[in-house]
Amino acid sequence: MLFRVKQVRNLFLFILPLIAIAGFDANAGQITPTFSQKLDIQVRYDNRSNRPSREQYRLRYYPSLAITSAWSVNSFVVTGDDFSSSHNTFGTDSTDYLYARRLYLRHETELGKTELGIIPTYKGRVSSTGLSKDGWITGIRHVRQLQNDTAIEIVVGQLANDQASEAFNIGSEDEYFEVEYSAKMGQRHSYEASFERMLSGTFARAEYRFRLNNEDTAFIELVQRTDESAAKIVVGTSGAFTASAFNTSYPVEYFAYYSYIDSSFGTRAELIEDFLGTGHGGSLEFSGVLSQKHDVEWFVRADVVDSVSRLLAGIKLSFES
């Protein structure tokens, strides 16, 4: 299996002194680090109208070293060969891609968190208008929890190369900047507003979520490219319901949305999860648990964008220690 990781010597030279500082408590002395890890395995069938069907697999590996209750070093290793793709295809030359895409130091307290290094593209939940959850940003993120269920996030760094093999190639990317304000209004309403600069473009993003009931949430998301007359909009709902078969009830989760992406929106549109194309589109996904004991899940998803349609179906297994 091919495993390519670029040199990260400069990053380690910066992170290691911070690890040494974090690993020492003035009152308790040296603290023993704790290692944890998680592995997600997915196998899926991908049938797209504009090309032959294929069978794919994905591995996501999350190792983490907790230095103290606040400090940790984290990494992320995944299959696939570009920013928004994390699947390898059986029976082709692209069956053995496996790359480390992140390596970062995190400090987290009740007041917020700071991440430094090759960091995730998200601070928590991944929005439909956000960057792919398998992507990366080289830089620093700071999230500050404010009063009344509000928070502000600032990310400063670099982002340009979308090849997973170049994720650790520091210093050759364009500037990346993001500032985001998020808030909850009671138990049912929440919103986010952000400004982003990336890939030689500037973007304003807004998101509103409304909790319909205990199970279902409706949302609307808009990203406007401010230096061009182009936008992306997503309107949808997510939640869960109970299906019955053979006198047995099965909880099923769903996710459905309509979207529109201008053809002139730019490269940012291609950096979302499983990008299918620009224009009018929609998606409907159902998922559930096959085995709680063994942490096995199933999913079925149908996507349509203009004249292109896609059907995805598969299973996912998780292991954690």
Predicted features along the sequence, with ranges:
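Structural signature of outer-membrane beta-barrel domains
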Residues: R44-R48, V78-D82, T121-K123, L159-D162, ...
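Short acidic (Asp/Glu) patches
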Residues: Y99-A100, G124, W136
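Cleavable N-terminal export/targeting peptides
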Residues: M1-T32, K293, E320-S321
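Residues on the solvent-exposed faces and adjacent turns
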Residues: I118
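Signature for the C-terminal beta-barrel architecture of outer-membrane proteins
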Residues: Q30-Q42, P52-Q56, A66-N74, E108-K113, ...
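Extracellular loop and loop/strand-boundary signature of outer-membrane beta-barrel proteins
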Residues: N47-R48, N88-T92, R125-T129, S165-A167, ...
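Beta-barrel outer-membrane channel/assembly domains of diderm bacteria
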Residues: F24-E115, H142-T150, I154, K184, ...
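Outer membrane beta-barrel transmembrane domains
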Residues: A240-E297
